[in-house]
Regions:
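Non-catalytic terminal segments and appended small domains
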Residues: 1-135
Length: 135
């Protein structure tokens, strides 16, 4: 398998800025979250993609939207792109959706002003009144 990308954590400074802005958390709370960030990984040898993990577990009531600073940036070879999709089971069974349907991370985003920090915006579109958790 050809390696075209490598995942990294954003700097602690960048994460604290983004996390506190998105969640209203204190700096000390954000530092604790930063320490728990896990890099994306393949679940099995045959996995088609990498699993991303939310830095914290979130619960969403129906119709609620959340913006998640992942703490992750990705170094991608020129000419390649990272595509982000919601986990199929959460979308298919429970209507948890990414607000832009598919997240597109271009190879030059790694050098963006925010260090290429990847954010995910999700909405609980569940019509059965079910609260959903993201981990």
């Amino acid at each position: 398998m050809q390696k075209v990308a490598k995942f990294h954590k954003v700097s602690e400074r960048q994460f604290l800025t983004d996390w506190c802005s998105a969640t209203g958390s204190s700096t000390s709370e954000a530092k604790a979250v930063y320490e728990k960030i896990r890099l994306p990984r393949r679940a099995t040898v045959g996995s088609a993609g990498y699993d991303f993990f939310a830095p914290e577990t979130f619960s969403l009531v129906p119709r609620e939207t959340i913006l998640i600073p992942t703490g992750i940036r990705v170094e991608i070879k020129d000419g390649w792109v990272l595509q982000l999709y919601p986990r199929s089971g959460l979308g298919f069974k429970y209507s948890l959706q990414m607000d832009n349907t598919v997240g597109i991370i271009d190879s030059d985003y790694f050098n963006a002003k925010n260090e290429g920090h990847i954010f995910v915006k999700m909405t609980n579109q569940n019509r059965q009144g079910r609260n959903l958790s993201v981990a």
